Amino acid sequence: MSARGQDIVSIIKEQIKEFGAPVSMTSVGSVIEVGDGIARIHGLSNAKYNELLEFPGGVLGIALNLEEDSVAAVILGEDSNIKEGDEVKATGRISEITVGKGMIGRVVDPLGRPLDGKGPIKAESTRPLERIAPNVVDRKSVNTPVQTGIKAIDAMIPIGRGQRELIIGDRSTGKTAIALDTIINQKGGDLVCIYVAIGQKASKVARIVALLEQYGAMEHTIVVAANSSDAVALQYLAPYAGCAIGEEFMEQGKDALVVYDDLTKHAWAYRQLSLLLRRPPGREAYPGDLFYLHSRLLERAARLNDKLGGGSLTALPIIETQAGDVSAYVPTNVISITDGQIYLEPDMFNAGIRPAVNVGISVSRVGSSAQTKAMKKVAGKLKMDMGQYRELAAFAQFGTSELDKSTRMQLERGQRVTEVLKQGQYQPVPAAKQVAILYATLNGYLDNIEVGKVRDYESGLYRFLEANFASVLTAIAKENVISADTEKTLKTALDEYKKGLVV
């Protein structure tokens, strides 16, 4: 062989050695049927449950039914361009979402894609949407309050960090308002809030985002939105996405709050998906695993023990009832999963008692362990007293002339407490001020005030305390206890305010 020929051979050998094309294997199938947001695919025999699939044009889908000779997938986008015979690739990734601090202040869809036009999100990491809930050993008892800023709730139905408290009521009774007030009240605090909008109108979600921005709440809030015009599969995934975002903060030792608005629409979306996937229907055409749908979501809310960082994820699911029927299928399911419920009554709402919390049906199973000692001291008997007042008020409709003096006094005080517990929307009250007004009410300082002037008394008291006795409010807020000295100063303040009051 000539020298030139040897040179060519050596060059070829060198190039062969340097050649290192990466070898990859992709599982590919083909669409055999498509329609109503569902695609049946042949050939993806190794597909996993909840695996992301890629359709032509970059449209994603999720494998939900793994059958003997095909896979049924829900399409997470527009399906009009997908046709029979199209190639489908398995991505090998389980459905996931970007998580981390970069999400705060953003509006995203359930796959973490931004919807607010503020550019791409700086992702710190990703998390799977579905995850097994923390077990009993990993948890810690709930003993730190989530201050909602709503007097009726903080005093009588306290919510703790790591609790799951259901907000339930008919349409237009103020369910979303309670959740938004709670988010707004966390301004300047350490609680990261996630608001999940499921099947809402895009205009309503835009209004909520604008409202949160107006009150400075988007600085600690993430909005996950799957609108009514979006694919039903996105509505099904939305709460799990919100939960995954919250879990990231919980596992970093921080506290997070997630609002699911609302799980009734989530159940409807799952029913629609299940029927399209030809799963056998059960009661009210819901699939048989409807309870598991919500239990596996809500069980992920927890307070972790100190070894795991002591973080927490609090859940506020919302359920819409029809004509006050709390015993319907979806409401009873969620009531049995959660640690209590706040029931909003249409009659109270229409009578101007807002928030329209029905104290008799509402309950917090965590109870006073999620209250500060100061609130516990002033509101200890309030729930029972209000329950008794409601019974007496119903009885007194037949006339009060024959009632004894103590019963009449109880009715009078009950009317004043009801007025004190009324509150305007988006006007959360700090915990120290709540303690002050409840102390005044339950110790008879409002007994001589006309019922119609109670709200004026309350707003005047707040201004008076801020101007002349700010140290009392500071002491209650810092110590979370009404010490003997603080109580003495508070009594002095209330006496002075009463003297200067023109009734």
UniProtKB/Swiss-Prot annotation:
It catalyses: ATP + H2O + 4 H(+)(in) = ADP + phosphate + 5 H(+)(out). GO terms for molecular function: ADP binding; ATP binding; proton-transporting ATP synthase activity, rotational mechanism. It is a peripheral membrane protein. GO terms for cellular component: plasma membrane; proton-transporting ATP synthase complex. Keywords: ATP synthesis, ATP-binding, Cell membrane, CF(1), Hydrogen ion transport, Ion transport, Membrane, Nucleotide-binding, Translocase, Transport. It is an enzyme of class 7 (translocase). Transmembrane segments: none annotated. Its EC number is 7.1.2.2. The record marks S362 as: Required for activity. ATP binds at G169, D170, R171, S172, T173, G174, K175, T176. Its main location: membrane. It is found in: Cell membrane. PANTHER family: ATP SYNTHASE SUBUNIT ALPHA, MITOCHONDRIAL. Belongs to the ATPase alpha/beta chains family. F-type ATPases have 2 components, CF(1) - the catalytic core - and CF(0) - the membrane proton channel. CF(1) has five subunits: alpha(3), beta(3), gamma(1), delta(1), epsilon(1). CF(0) has three main subunits: a(1), b(2) and c(9-12). The alpha and beta chains form an alternating ring which encloses part of the gamma chain. CF(1) is attached to CF(0) by a central stalk formed by the gamma and epsilon chains, while a peripheral stalk is formed by the delta and b chains. Produces ATP from ADP in the presence of a proton gradient across the membrane. The alpha chain is a regulatory subunit. This is ATP synthase subunit alpha. It comes from Dehalococcoides mccartyi (strain ATCC BAA-2100 / JCM 16839 / KCTC 5957 / BAV1). The lineage of its organism: Bacteria, Bacillati, Chloroflexota, Dehalococcoidia, Dehalococcoidales.
